Amino acid sequence: MKIKTVEFARSAFNEEQYPKDNLPQIVIVGRSNVGKSTLINTVLNRKNLAKTSSRPGKTRGINFYLINNKFYLVDLPGYGYAKVSKEMKKQWAHNIETFLNTSQNLRHGLFLIDIRRNPTEDDFLMINWFKHKNLPFTVVLTKADKVNKSESRKAVEDICKIFKINREEVIIFSALEKMGVSQVLSIFEKYA
């Protein structure tokens, strides 16, 4: 798929701010600092479209990116970040839950996990939500350049066992090496 146009449509903090058109939405979910913004910038070939930071918690609203005027890529705030107030965590959880439960246009989930880390309880909750809703999702193992090939293969095997998914539902991704970009674009193409 060729990315022709990318527009930062809006950052929403409540349901009234979501786009009102009926374009399909692909949502990106994962823990804080897992590489969601980096994946967006790499796959869309835009250097600073999504703001990145080495400090977790950079994305606070629900960010909507309009791709080729055909679909939205939706970047949710990361979960699991310990260094914010309980009130802020509660607000983020509420915003994520509200979006996931009210969006009528959600078509696919890109579920990001750092290839070096084990899934958390929050990761299991999120995967189970997608399964419960019968929504297609793909697990994207990020930061693959940080491990060798055998560690990468083992991580994929482990994720498939843990989440009870097929190998085709997992993408190994590295922004540094541009690994996995074409597979993510193939998912986009289904909704363009």
Curated annotation (Swiss-Prot):
PROSITE patterns: G_ENGB. GTP binds at residues 30-37, 57-61, 75-78, 142-145, 173-175. GO terms for biological process: division septum assembly. The keyword Cell inner membrane does not apply. It comes from the Bacteria. CDD domains: YihA_EngB. SUPFAM superfamilies: P-loop containing nucleoside triphosphate hydrolases. Keywords: Cell cycle, Cell division, GTP-binding, Magnesium, Metal-binding, Nucleotide-binding, Septation. GO terms for cellular component: cytosol. One of its GO terms (molecular function) is GTP binding. Its cofactor is Mg(2+). Residues 22-192 form the EngB-type G domain. Coiled coil: none annotated. Pfam families: MMR_HSR1. Mg(2+) binds at residues 37, 59. InterPro entries: G_ENGB_dom (IPR030393), GTP-bd (IPR006073), GTP-bd_ribosome_bio_YsxC (IPR019987), P-loop_NTPase (IPR027417), Small_GTP-bd (IPR005225). Signal peptide: none annotated. Gene3D superfamilies: P-loop containing nucleotide triphosphate hydrolases (3.40.50.300). NCBIfam families: GTPase_YsxC, small_GTP. PANTHER family: ENGB-TYPE G DOMAIN-CONTAINING PROTEIN, MSS1/TRME-RELATED GTP-BINDING PROTEIN. Necessary for normal cell division and for the maintenance of normal septation. Belongs to the TRAFAC class TrmE-Era-EngA-EngB-Septin-like GTPase superfamily. EngB GTPase family. This is Probable GTP-binding protein EngB. It comes from Thermoanaerobacter pseudethanolicus (strain ATCC 33223 / 39E).
